[in-house]
Every structure is written in structure tokens, then in C-alpha cells.
């Protein structure tokens, strides 16, 4: 019996873990740029292994990059992101996020914030607001204050016995928001970075150009069980 149990354990299949870190030394290999704006040029560049993504003043530019693969599932996602100083009221977001569709999306979006957001986060004059959002199933958003500069953003999708996720948003190694969500590894995500002039993160159209920087993006996850985009 002992030998049988040992053999059974040895033959049990291991869960496939996929792991990668993009440091952008090879440009945006594995990614593609897309936008929702009127810019005539692509607003990104890579210099010395740092990915820069930009928007223009007095526009509602939305500059984004996404992974080519869409099968990322439960596990840990990390972004090393530089948040620039943002002028009071300017509507701009520096984003680090996961996306399947408009109902399956988990975000970090960092901007100056509206007066209401800044009050909720108790943001000081030299701070910006990091909005942590699950777009649906259920919808939830929370705001915390951080200073401009380099930060480590992390989203963890932890599997529960009921087949659903607990999602955890962490900043610089500290968990800042936790949510039980109503879907699980059947949903395959793409990974995104972005700088977007979004109205919800300020009070006025941006009066300045903005650039967010990404030193690296990494993950250690399992593949989703179903990855067809809906």
C-alpha cells in the first residue's frame, strides 16, 4: 500500500506555472501599442530598458500597451512604475492593470484625483491618489495616497475552494485592498500599462504633457482555463 501511494504521488501531474519578467531591454517584444485618441504618432519609447508612455496636454489621449498573450490566470502580477508629479486638477492616469473585457478588469490607476477622491485618501498636497478597482462582479474601488516616484504595484489572484478568486492589491509590499470576486480561472487576462487622460481622475483637461515609466512588468501565474475573448 505504501509503495502504491508513493507511486501515485510521483505520477500526479503538477500544476503548470508560467513565469516571466519583461525588462524592455528588447523593446516591447511580446507587447503591442494601441490608443484611443487623435495622436498621429505612437506615444511610447524605450530608453536604457525603461518603457516610457506619454500623453499630450489639452487632449484626452489614451496611450496603452498590452501583452500579445491573453491566457494569464491565477497568481501574482507586478509592475515597477514611475509616477510623475501631477499638477492639481489635471485629468491623467498612470495605469498598471489586467483586462479581459469591460466586466473583467482589475486596475491600478494613479492620478491627482478629484477633490472627493483626495479627501477619501487623505491625500496631502505633495501626494497623488492610487485608485484600485475591480470593474464588475462586484464593482469596487478604493483610493489611497502615495507620493510621486517609483512604486511596486502588485495584483494577486488567489484561488478559493469555490473556484472563485480573492483579489489583493498591494503597493510597495503592503496589501491595500482585498476583495472576493465572482469569477475565477476560467477568465484569461491580458496585462496592460497605460497613460491616459481620464476625466474621473481629476477636475480639468490636462494642462501638461505626462509620461509614465515602467522599469519592468512580471508575473508568476497559472494559465487560465478558458481564454477566448468575449
Regions found by a protein language model. Give the residues of each.
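Extracellular glycan-recognition surfaces and repeat-rich motifs
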Residues: 28-52
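Secretory/extracellular carbohydrate-interaction modules
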Residues: 53-125
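Short strand-turn-strand beta-turns centered on an Asx-Gly dipeptide
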Residues: 170-174
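Short tryptophan-centered beta-strand motifs in secreted/extracellular beta-sheet-rich domains
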Residues: 79, 148-159, 167-169
